[in-house]
Amino acid sequence: ISILFSLIGMSHANEVNIFSARHYDSDVQLYEKFTAKTGIEVNVISGKDKALQKRIKEEGIDSKADLYITADAGRLSAFDAAGMFQNSMSPVIKTVVPSNFRSKNWTGIAKRARIIYYSPERVNINDLNGMRYEDLADPKWKGKIVIRQSNNIYNQSLVASLIKNNGKKATADWSKSVVKNMARTPKGNDRAQILAVAAGEADIAVANTYYLALMLS
């Protein structure tokens, strides 16, 4: 899960204030449909994730935020742990959203995959059959992998999932092996990783799915 939605407070009957770190036209279309169906106006305050969280914290109970939308469960879990959300789960959400895509204080509205990109010219497709994240530690990929820095929330959530499934020690060993397999020091965003493969700097990249579609559009 990667794009998440969290209730902060109670809106006025005729409007709802959304603090959003997302920047997609599809969201605007969703808000417009909501207003057309309910008559409730949607006010959107856009900004960077950290800036929005800082504002909400500083404003406290006086915050005008009703809903907070951001990317990745990792961000929401940390904000939730700070006590910034309230239990607002409705029966509708429980019916529509699978339990692994929500908590008692937030729910997912979309999901994205963090996948493995590869160069078809330099990588044999047979080497990728059944490939898992864990396989990125295989020495055969030495000098061939690019991925964002470890402080990126997408990578942090990926590591968290590996810890959940494989334990801390195994994940620590995996991380060290992946570092040894890197084609370069981590830099740039997800698009930069994909471009590195296209440019021949690496054979394998880890990045979210939608970036390729955006780059091709």
Regions found by a protein language model. Give the residues of each.
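Short amphipathic alpha-helical coupling segments at ligand-binding clamshell hinges
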Residues: 30, 173-174, 208
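Early extracytoplasmic/lumenal segment of secretory-pathway proteins
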Residues: 13-78
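A beta-strand-loop signature enriched in Asp, Gly, Thr, and Trp
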Residues: 208-217
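Conserved glycosyltransferase catalytic-site signature
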Residues: 49-50, 190-191, 209
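Extracytoplasmic ligand-binding site segments that recognize negatively charged/polar headgroups
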Residues: 21, 25, 64-201, 212
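Bacterial N-terminal signal peptides
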Residues: 1-7
